[in-house]
Curated annotation (Swiss-Prot):
Belongs to the universal ribosomal protein uL30 family. One of its GO terms (molecular function) is structural constituent of ribosome. Part of the 50S ribosomal subunit. GO terms for cellular component: cytosolic large ribosomal subunit. One of its GO terms (biological process) is translation. It comes from the Bacteria. This is Large ribosomal subunit protein uL30. CDD domains: Ribosomal_L30 (cd01658).
């Protein structure tokens, strides 16, 4: 399976609680933090919900 590197590029300050929890569920804590995750439909759904806050690269 492919892997995705996800970076939180914008702050969650002032964002709805659902978006904050989604960012936390992806394993991101601070701005500019990154994680590498497996590419699957569940992760894609989470990314789609907060894509305006993230930068995604395929690894």
């Amino acid at each position: 399976m492919a892997k995705l590197q996800i970076t939180l590029t914008r702050s969650v300050i002032g964002r709805p609680e659902t978006q904050r929890k989604t960012v936390e569920a992806l394993g991101l804590k601070k701005t500019n933090s990154s994680v590498v995750v497996e590419d699957n439909p569940a992760i894609r759904g989470q990314i789609n919900k907060v894509k305006h806050l993230l930068t995604i690269e395929e690894k």
